[in-house]
Structure formats: structure tokens, C-alpha cells
Amino acid sequence: MNTCIQLLILCLVTVINSENSTDNSTENTIKNETENATETELPETFENETENVSETELPEIIENETKIEALNLPQIPKQKYCRTEGQYCSRTYFHRCCGNLVCQLHGFFNGTCVQCLAERKFCIWSSECCSKRCRLFRCRKNPYVQVIPY
């Protein structure tokens, strides 16, 4: 047990000594580099860099970057597959109704675009029904709207 503790202490001491030696070496290299750099070298490098950039390069670079950014933006999909009122629809992405129109199905993926769905027609959301009430995938009569006979 004592030998294990002694080995651990020995390892810690060697690690600490190696870290101290690397710190000293890096400090020496930093001092040497700062001594080698003179005051006249720094302004010359800045002057050379500013001479290389002309005024006409910047707008071209900015224009190219904005064009590239515009290409990377998510585009709003154009509704080239949407159908108008009275046309064929299938409730799929390729044959959907435009705007607020709803597809009234007559069979399996076979329907017509209409303003709203009549009573007892197949629906998914209440907003599709004229009565604004969809229950168990069928448009239902709205009990709150009563027809008063004349």
C-alpha cells in the first residue's frame, strides 16, 4: 500500500516538474519573438495589407456574398400543383386545393375542390366543414345554429 502511494506521489511530482519546464520554455520563446520584432516592421505590414485592398473590390465581394446567401435561404414553395375550385384533387401534395379551398373526396384519392364540405362529408378538421364541426371524420350539423321556418 505504501509503495502505491509513493509511486503516485512520484508521478505527480514528475508531472508538475514537466509543466513548469514547458511554461519556462514558452515564456522564453515569447520574449525572444518580441525582441526580434522592431517598431518599423509592424506599420509596414499594415500598410502593405491596406494597399492590396482597393475600393472596387469590396462592393463586388459584398454583392457575391449576398447572392450566395440568397441561394442558401429556404425558398417559399410555389404552389404550382394547387387546384382551383371545381378541379380534380386528391388530398396529396401534388393535387391539393389552393388557398382556403377544401378537397371533397368522391372516392379513394379522387375529389373536387370546393369552398367547404357539406354535412356528412369526409373531413379531418372542423375548419373544412361549412358547419365548422367535424366529428368522427364526418361533417356534422351545428346544433347551435337553428333554422327558423317562415
UniProtKB/Swiss-Prot annotation:
What UniProt keywords are attached to this protein's entry? Answer: Disulfide bond, Glycoprotein, Knottin, Secreted, Signal
Q: Does the keyword Secreted apply?
A: yes
Major location category of this protein:
secreted
Coiled-coil residue spans: none
UniProt KW Glycoprotein keyword: yes
Cell compartment(s), UniProt = Secreted
Tell me the protein family, please.
Belongs to the UPF0506 family.
Comment on protein domains: The presence of a 'disulfide through disulfide knot' structurally defines this protein as a knottin.
Q: What is this protein called?
A: UPF0506 protein SJCHGC02381
This protein's species is Schistosoma japonicum (Blood fluke)
